[in-house]
Amino acid sequence: MSSSIEEVKATIKSVKLTDSQAEKLSKLIDSLPKILSGLDNPEYDEIFGYRINTKDKPYVDESIRNEILLKFLAADDYNLELSEKRLIDSLNWRNEFQPLSAAFEETFDKELNELGVITNFPNSNLKITTWNLYGNLKNPKKIFEKFGANNKVSKLPGSQFLRWRVGLMEKSLQLIDFTSTTDNRIAQVHDYNNVSMFKIDPGMKKATKEIITIFGANYPELLSTKFFINVPLIMGWVFTFFKTIRVITEATLKKFQVLNHGNLSESFNPDELPKVYGGKVEKSLFDIDVSDDIKLSEYGEVILKKVGDEEINHINDDVE
């Protein structure tokens, strides 16, 4: 049964849709059976922990599903053909990469624990933020190697750094409200304190490009602002690099704020922000990190169990 324009409009709370936009979203929703049937794995229908399927299926939250689909539409300026392709490619990527596993099952090099933090500031305009602390990257070559120690993880694509970074993003998305007008995106802070341009590992440059490409393709319309702080003037090449690799849209570039200091008190509530970033809080970022407390959505748990069961069956088949 097709979704009417008014029915679709009623499910979207984050923005006010025009009739034309609602019609495009309605068509994308109606295309879901066709899209899913053409996937590498038609059973994989999860994005950001939510089920992207017809509303008669269990675990489908129609409002959140539609808000997520709307982000895919908006990312391609409501071009239905491009949005369908983006959705197909993203579902296929998620099936192969297993980002929920990266976020909630895998363990990484201890050094990565010092490299990223997620904060939840309920009284700030920017509530959910991921922090990337590049100055703490002590052993880049090790980080950028492929997994090898864990048999399960070694079969999944990506370096430790890439899988960890995707996992951090996935965790942060469990905290946003897709139906909110103000809290349906996250902020990112990239802190370059103590980073020398002479210490930038070639693997880090490669990983940066890979992350930008993956995030641009699979995490549409989820970024409110990206801060680059404590950036030495001599590191201007970093941002020239972003432009020259041409994997970032102009709209995304406009969300970048580059600062040669670390004072973020104008963007975050000082009462929630650590002193090192211009706030009033005595604690460090790591003291207020919420990443270990984040719970995966119900359907995300279902998907992880399903993938795990399939893996066990494959192992049993191989043994037999």
Swiss-Prot record:
GO molecular function list: heme binding; metal ion binding; phosphatidylinositol transfer activity
Q: What is its main location?
A: cytoplasm
Q: How does it sit in the membrane?
A: Peripheral membrane protein
Q: Which UniProt keywords apply?
A: Cytoplasm, Endoplasmic reticulum, Heme, Iron, Lipid transport, Membrane, Metal-binding, Microsome, Transport
**SMART domains (UniProt xref):** SEC14
Q: Which reaction does it catalyse?
A: a 1,2-diacyl-sn-glycero-3-phospho-(1D-myo-inositol)(in) = a 1,2-diacyl-sn-glycero-3-phospho-(1D-myo-inositol)(out)
Q: Does the keyword Membrane apply?
A: yes
Compartments reported by the entry: Cytoplasm; Endoplasmic reticulum membrane; Microsome membrane
Q: According to its record, what are the GO cellular component terms?
A: cortical endoplasmic reticulum; cytosol; endoplasmic reticulum membrane; plasma membrane
Q: Which of this chain's residues are annotated to bind heme?
A: Y134, R165, H190, Y192, K226
The organism's superkingdom is given as Eukaryota
- Which residues does the UniProt record annotate as the domain CRAL-TRIO? 120-285
GO term, biological process aspect, one: regulation of establishment of cell polarity
A Pfam family hit: CRAL_TRIO
- Look up the record and name the cofactor or cofactors this protein needs: heme b
Q: What family does the database annotate?
A: Belongs to the SFH5 family.
The protein's job, in short, is: Non-classical phosphatidylinositol (PtdIns) transfer protein (PITP), which exhibits PtdIns-binding/transfer activity in the absence of detectable PtdCho-binding/transfer activity. Regulates PtdIns(4,5)P2 homeostasis at the plasma membrane. Heme-binding protein that may play a role in organic oxidant-induced stress responses.
**Name assigned to this protein:** Phosphatidylinositol transfer protein SFH5
